[in-house]
């Protein structure tokens, strides 16, 4: 499935994804993860004066999550048992930079996200961007 290019159609696409989950027996509650562009567009768009975000909130009734690391969106169940997060036992600290007043360090840790049930999420790809016209 693909996110529509018109943000006002997001509720229809998300409703179709929810139907797809229900048809394969995946119960809710459900959440929607949106990439940065999709989330910003959803938060800023209204349909005849009513925020499109509120249309989506009525459909999902759980979290709508800003997920800048993804492109497009995912509609997934949060019922439990479908995903697993394994956090590594290694933590490292590193040096980034310094000034005369501060030192910038970072922490790094490994983790693995396991997708246990293939039907527990529906991906909505980003809409195709229009290609520039050749002159």
Predicted regions and their residues:
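Sequence/fold signature of self-assembling virion shell proteins
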Residues: 45-135
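Extended, solvent-exposed, turn-rich assembly/linker loops in the middle of proteins
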Residues: 1-57
């Amino acid at each position: 499935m693909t996110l529509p290019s018109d943000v006002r159609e997001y509720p229809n696409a998300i409703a179709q994804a929810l139907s797809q989950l229900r048809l394969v027996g995946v119960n809710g509650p459900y959440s929607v993860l949106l990439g940065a562009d999709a989330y910003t567009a959803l938060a800023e768009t209204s349909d005849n004066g009513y925020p499109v975000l509120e249309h989506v909130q009525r459909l999902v009734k759980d979290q709508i999550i800003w997920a800048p690391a993804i492109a497009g969106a995912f509609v997934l169940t949060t019922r439990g048992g479908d995903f697993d997060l394994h956090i590594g036992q290694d933590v490292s600290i590193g040096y980034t930079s310094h000034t005369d007043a501060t030192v910038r360090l970072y922490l790094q840790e490994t983790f693995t996200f396991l997708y246990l049930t293939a039907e527990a999420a529906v991906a909505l790809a980003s809409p195709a961007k229009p290609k520039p016209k050749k002159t």
